[in-house]
Amino acid sequence: MLLNIPYHLENFIGGNFIGPLSGNFIDNINPATGAVYGQIPDSNAKDVDVAVKAAKKAFPAWSVLPVEKKFIILNKIAELIDENLEELALAETNDNGKPLWLSKQVDIPRASANFRFFATGIMHFANESHQMEDKAVNYTLRQPIGIVGCISPWNLPLYLFTWKIAPALAAGNCVIAKPSEVTPLTAFLLGKICKEAGLPDGVLNIVHGTGPHCGEAIVKHPDIKAISFTGSTRAGQHIASVAAPMFKKLSLELGGKNPNIIFNDCNWEKMLTETIRSSFGNQGQICLCGSRILLERSAYENFKKHFISIVKNLTVGDPLDEKSKQGAIVSKVHFEKILNCISIAKEEGGTILCGGNAVKLTGRCADGFFIEPTIIEGLTQDCKTNQEEIFGPVVTIQPFDTEEEAIAMANNSTYGLAATIWTQDISKANRVAAKVEAGIIWVNCWLVRDLRTPFGGMKNSGVGREGGWEVLRFFTEAKNVCIQF
């Protein structure tokens, strides 16, 4: 199929593409060029209400559709994503600024994997039963909630959009989904793919717009019974404050200030390779990035020398150039925020070991938003730079002397999303993993994902878990039936 992209995107509601009721649009900017190359609907509560009505109409039939038939449709969506990988990857890169090779190798394949995984998973999602000897039998039904809201971020647009939508649909719900207004293209194209795959009208409704206008309306709508959100902790706090009095189910995957704990007995070459990825992958715009690098003191200077040498050779360039290792920052606002964070780090006494500046390219990217990969040392644990999420190509490095000190430093954060531990001592790895306050721990690797496992954070990094059975439980209501005999 040919995924044509119009200049003016439209909402996907009730199986149709329609403009915003207000007639208002927002500019869509390519971060690599700084140029406007399209417009998206500036949707509001009225558009959301139309989407909810379409979802309510579709829900009775979709909720009882046999899982074998749901599998066929959801698996077809996965196949069409694979078939259109080139077009989807280019759209993702133009919207987000990430290197095209990354969109092709990671983002789009993962989007199809999300649909394929939950298409299969729902067929094995079993109800529970408990027999009370000679008294009674209990069985627990897992039934779809109804209409749910899925709000996704701009850093991994289609990857995380489908991570929410696929299990929600598989569980029998109808969805009102809002992609980030900064990266709307692949969400728009997903609507076309779902239509082609035979997803019934109204089962998935994609409404574009800003958080205050559109996202707020989704959270506040009385007929939307659950909200799955990925984004900043501040936005998550606001969503929780709005949704809690309405008793909505909430899944909030929020920020992180993740420690990368490196002991001197690790596999050195593998650690360096993966630490480059975990520090600067997707320009550091991944909530799981290890932005606080904690090193055993005996390895500190050697690591610093090799790390700086590698980082200085990371090519920052046009995302369409296959030689570019680092692409553009997603928006001018975020670009300016990151540069301001680097200035604050200097004011706090940090030493810039590498990077720290905007990058000025030539040609089509002359007005794009590019920043050098940046390494900072000499900061205290409690300073703003080490405590607040920057969400960019910026890492700090700090030494530690003992295992206990490493754990204390790792836990010195209001966040608790992820952590990475590097050591060949399996006993040490288990001790540290048990004590680090994070929902996801990687040992001698980073971002190795099994979609069957729980995904989510502790402390200010969120509420609830996604992935596997956890997310299917979230998107269903448990009903216990007790029969006495």
Regions found by a protein language model. Name each.
Residues A226, R234-T380, V443:
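ALDH superfamily catalytic-core signature
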Residues F59, S63, A78-L85, A89, ...:
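Structural signal for hydrophobic packing residues in well-ordered secondary-structure cores
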Residues M1-A32:
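Hydrophobic face of amphipathic alpha-helices that form TPR/SEL1-like repeat modules
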Residues A35-F125, K135:
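Glycine-rich loop-to-alpha-helix module at the N-terminal edge of alpha/beta enzyme cores
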Residues Y37-S43, A58-V64, C150, N260-F263, ...:
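Short, well-ordered beta-strand elements within core beta-sheets of diverse protein domains
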Residues N127-K270, F400:
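Rossmann-like NAD(P) dinucleotide-binding subdomain of oxidoreductase/dehydrogenase enzymes
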Residues G15, G34, K70, E92, ...:
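Residue-level signal for inorganic ion chemistry
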